Amino acid sequence: QKGYVAVDFYDGSIMYDFSTDVTTICDIDLFKKAPVINDKGVDWFGTKRLKAPEEYMEGCAIDEQTNIFTLGALIFEFFGRFSDEEIHQRYCNNQFIPCTLPNWQLSEESYQVATKAVSLNKSERYLTFAEFWYEWKAANSNF
């Protein structure tokens, strides 16, 4: 909405207080005004566990769809189960891989929404956070 892109957002930026049921976003120190172009190639900011494909390729646009990928990957971290080997492969292959549906803890509908968010093909992802949020809420309306 404000024209900024998060360039270093990951699970370490989120704190949850179980006693108050409050989630806090913290340590968000690197936002850039769009348009943002990856000028570092594979050394672009962020953890390999959650990075979108364009965050490895010099000259690619880093935008809202990139941030949607990161959020989708975070959602998989929270609600998916991964073996140590699967996590290791993300680092070796420079590629986030979602868990399989049997290793997903929420509904199949929410799995489909999260899977679209982390599509390797940027044109297949949600275009906006508003679209992603709408689909996520619809898929999780029973919770």
Report residues per predicted region:
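Conserved protein kinase catalytic/activation segment
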Residues: S13-I28
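Conserved C-terminal C-lobe helix
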Residues: W104-L120
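Conserved activation segment of eukaryotic-like protein kinases, specifically the C-terminal portion
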Residues: K40-E55
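Catalytic-loop of the protein kinase fold
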Residues: Q1-D17
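A conserved short helix/loop substructure at the end of the activation segment
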Residues: V118-E131
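Conserved catalytic-loop aspartate of Hanks-type protein kinases
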Residues: N67
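Conserved end of the kinase activation segment
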Residues: E54-E64
